[in-house]
Amino acid sequence: MKMRSKYAIILFFVVALVIIEKERNIISRVSDKFTLKFPHAESVAPNNTISARSLTKNNSLLANSVAAVWKLLKARRSYSSLQSAASSDVRKVLKGRKHLLLMATTRTGSSFVGEFFNQNNDIFYLFEPLWHVEKTVTFEPGGMNAVASSIIYRDVVQQLMLCDLYTLENFLFPMADRHLTGILFRRGSSKSLCEGEVCTPPKKGGTEKFPCRLRDCGLLNLTLATQACLQKQHVAIKTVPLRQLEFLRPLVEDFRINLKIIQLVRDPRAVLASRMVAFPSKYNAWKKWANEGRVPDDDEVGKIRGNCENLRATAQLGISQPPWLKDRFLLMRYEDIALEPVKRAQEMYRFSGIPMTPEVKKWIYENTQVSKASNNIYSTHKISSEQFEKWRLGLPFKIARVVQQVCEPAMKLFGYKLVKDAATLANRSASLLENRNFWIT
C-alpha cells in the first residue's frame, strides 16, 4: 500500500505541473474526474483506483509527497545536465533539428507509415510512447475528458520532442530502476532504441517485455536513449491517443521545437472492419450483428460517430491553416500512400523539411513489393496496392451503411465515396476514392 501511494503521489504531481500552465482553470474543473490506474499486485485488488481528490485529502500520504516531488525534480535535473554537457557538435545538430508528429488512430496504417521515418538513420523515432500514459492516467466519462487527457498527452510529447525521455519514468510500472526499464512499449519498433550504445549487452535477470527485433539488447537505459536522441539530427513520434489538434498550439509555438504535424486518416469503413478483426472482444457487438443479426446499441454507434467527428474537426482546423499552423500541418490518406508509397513518402519528407534517405526508399520497395503479404494483422510487410481495399470483401453492407450515416461529414471531407448497395461495396474495380490534394504549400 505504501508503494501504491508513492506511485499515486508521483502521478498526482505530474498533473500538478500541468495545472500550473495556461489550462489551470480547465484542469481544476475536471480534477474530480481524474483517475489513476496502477498495475496489479498481490496486495492490490484488480481494477483498484485512487482519485486525485482523495489523494489531496489523505494526510497519511503527505509524508511521501516531498520524496515524490524530489524524484521528479531529480529526473529533470539529470536531463538538464545532459543538455549542458552536450558537445558543440550536438548543439549544432539541435539548432537545425526538425520535429515531426504523426497523428493517427488505431488500424489506419500508422505503424506502416511510421516506418518511413523509423528507417531514416538521421531520425530518432519513437513508436507510441503515450501508450504508457494512456494505461496509467484515465478520466471518468464526461465532457471534459478529452480536454484534460489531451493536455497531459501534449505535455509528455513536448518533453519527448526535447529528448527528455526521463518523463516516461513517471508512467512506467514497475518503476524504472536507475533509469533502467524492461517494459517500454514496443521498444523493438524504434530502431533508435535498439542500436549503437543504447543496445547494451544483455545481463542475467534482465527481461525485456518488448525486446528489440534484430539485436539482443539488455534493459533499456533511458540515459543512453536520451543521449542518442540528442545526437540525432531530427525527432519523429508516432502517436494514437493524441487526436485534438487545437491543444497542440503551445507545442507548435514552443521556440525550442520546429514542429510539423501529419494527420493520417483512413476510410472509416475500413478502420471498423480492421478493428473487428484485430480487437474481436472490444468490437464484439459489431461482429454479432454481422454474424447473428444483433443490432449494436446506440453507445457503440455513438463511439464511431464521435471518432469520425474528432477526425473531421482536427482535419478541418489543419486544412484551414490558422496563422499558428501555417505550413505546419499535412493531411494524408492511407489509401494514397498504399497506392503510391514512394511518391507519398517524398511528399511527407518534403513537407517535414527532412531529407529522404536511400535506406527509406529501399525499405518501402522491399516492404510493399513483397512476393507474399503477411497474414499478421500487425505486420508492416504488405503488398500495399492490393491490400488496402481487401476489407471491402469482408465487411457486410449493413455495417458499412451505418458507418456512412454517422461518418458522412468526415468521409466527404476526406474524399471517400459512399456506396448504395452490397454489389458496389464488393466491386473493387469501382474506386471509393475521390481525387483530393491535401498538400499545403
Swiss-Prot record:
Its main location: Golgi. 3'-phosphoadenylyl sulfate binds at residues 106-112, 266-274. N-glycosylated. This is Carbohydrate sulfotransferase 3. It is an enzyme of class 2 (transferase). Glycans are attached at residues 47, 58, 221, 427. Keywords: Carbohydrate metabolism, Glycoprotein, Golgi apparatus, Membrane, Signal-anchor, Transferase, Transmembrane, Transmembrane helix. One of its GO terms (biological process) is N-acetylglucosamine metabolic process. Residues 1-4 are cytoplasmic. It holds the Pfam family Sulfotransfer_1. In electric organ, it is moderately expressed in spinal cord and electric lobe and undetectable in non-neural tissues. Expressed in a punctate distribution in the innervated portion of electrocytes. In the CNS, it is localized within the somas of motor neurons and neurons of the electromotor nucleus. Belongs to the sulfotransferase 1 family. Gal/GlcNAc/GalNAc subfamily. GO terms for cellular component: Golgi membrane. It is a single-pass type II membrane protein. The chain crosses the membrane at residues 5-21. It is found in: Golgi apparatus membrane. InterPro entries: Carbohydrate_sulfotransferase (IPR016469), Gal/GlcNAc/GalNAc_ST (IPR051135), P-loop_NTPase (IPR027417), Sulfotransferase_dom (IPR000863). Sulfotransferase that utilizes 3'-phospho-5'-adenylyl sulfate (PAPS) as sulfonate donor to catalyze the transfer of sulfate to position 6 of the N-acetylgalactosamine (GalNAc) residue of chondroitin. Chondroitin sulfate constitutes the predominant proteoglycan present in cartilage and is distributed on the surfaces of many cells and extracellular matrices. Catalyzes with a lower efficiency the sulfation of Gal residues of keratan sulfate, another glycosaminoglycan. Can also catalyze the sulfation of the Gal residues in sialyl N-acetyllactosamine (sialyl LacNAc) oligosaccharides. It catalyses: chondroitin beta-D-glucuronate + n 3'-phosphoadenylyl sulfate = chondroitin 6'-sulfate + n adenosine 3',5'-bisphosphate + n H(+); 3'-phosphoadenylyl sulfate + keratan = adenosine 3',5'-bisphosphate + keratan 6'-sulfate. Its EC number is 2.8.2.17, 2.8.2.21.
